[in-house]
């Protein structure tokens, strides 16, 4: 369903800018206040959906107008997504909540091919976007008389502490048959792999967030939304298979010694979790402070192994992006990726697999990471990530909306307010060329040569053909 929502955001012109404020993301020294005003263009008589499939936001950043394009992350959850918690008497309670109409988006800034965005629209707009090479955060302000939001640069958030944050993995990379350049991989969609991810939240996290399971759930969903974007350009699709919250106490000994915690968690996954929940990889999200400034640890090349397809990650920052990048890093180890060296590059940024986690983390993998990941996959051939899992949004509905594009169906119509596609027939509306895709804008193919995906490794950017809504893959992406 392609639905355009235009929200005009006006920049406040009084003393909020430049002052200091404590937000959910931390103590921010310089920020702007903006006010979303929704202007909806819907067909006459159409019903406003709770969360549109696509949205556009018009806003001012540093006094300049920009347009933020967002698209719902339809492949965020696997079909059998589940949530588990424990009652006060220790009973395991598992549900399969409906997550088809979720509120998590990814996107880009108009006329900025290097831009990215990861946004939650659950309660206002919360997340981050990159504009002209600078990372910005946005979140609602808790003001009773308005819908004010704060927008600020990530670098303007005060450091939570000065200690370096480290990954606990120390092994060196030993290549199988070294590939000299990432471009030698010649990856294409046939190489696509799929990781069904299960995240366990320990009791310390449950206590840290005052037993607010909804807040914990949203934090995890936001993290996976970020992780999915980073792995997309590696031809690896991340789907969230489930969440388990240890609400009545830890089921393993979570301790400051990260090797011991990782070992215990791996054993628990093998003997308990795998017997009751199908998934490919499990990550423990904990509030405990590990020894030696370590914030994460994982088994290198452990993917698909009952015990070793695991990692442990400290919830070390109020900024969800930083924790999400840490979990992306640890999952990278499970996929055979080692730490970057000085010769590795992802286009001038601090890359995901840096052994020291930056306060301004990157969502990009380096050229070395591509080589190591796909050398591992091609040589070790892990089987669990080969099969494409069903997604929540591929469930059949009375009016198509299932993305399968069966015979005779021209578009994924979804619902009645789709401006590009008839919901009753799943045929294109007159004048429409497309309904979705990186090279589709307002139901029309974007011009030939329009950059639709930026390569951070070899600068061989992907561009639209002018004949399709799809963005063809040419380059390699960090």
From Swiss-Prot:
Intracellular or extracellular location(s): Secreted
Family statement: Belongs to the venom metalloproteinase (M12B) family. P-II subfamily. P-IIa sub-subfamily.
Organism: Crotalus atrox
Key word Manganese present: no
MF annotations from Gene Ontology: metal ion binding; metalloendopeptidase activity; toxin activity
CDD domains tied to this protein: ZnMc_adamalysin_II_like (cd04269)
Protein name: Zinc metalloproteinase/disintegrin
InterPro entries named among the record's database cross-references: Disintegrin_CS (IPR018358), Disintegrin_dom (IPR001762), Disintegrin_dom_sf (IPR036436), MetalloPept_cat_dom_sf (IPR024079), Peptidase_M12B (IPR001590), Peptidase_M12B_N (IPR002870), Reprolysin_adamalysin (IPR034027)
Active-site annotation: 330
Oligomeric form and interacting partners: Monomer (disintegrin).
Pfam families named in the record: Disintegrin, Pep_M12B_propep, Reprolysin
Cofactor: Zn(2+)
Major subcellular site: secreted
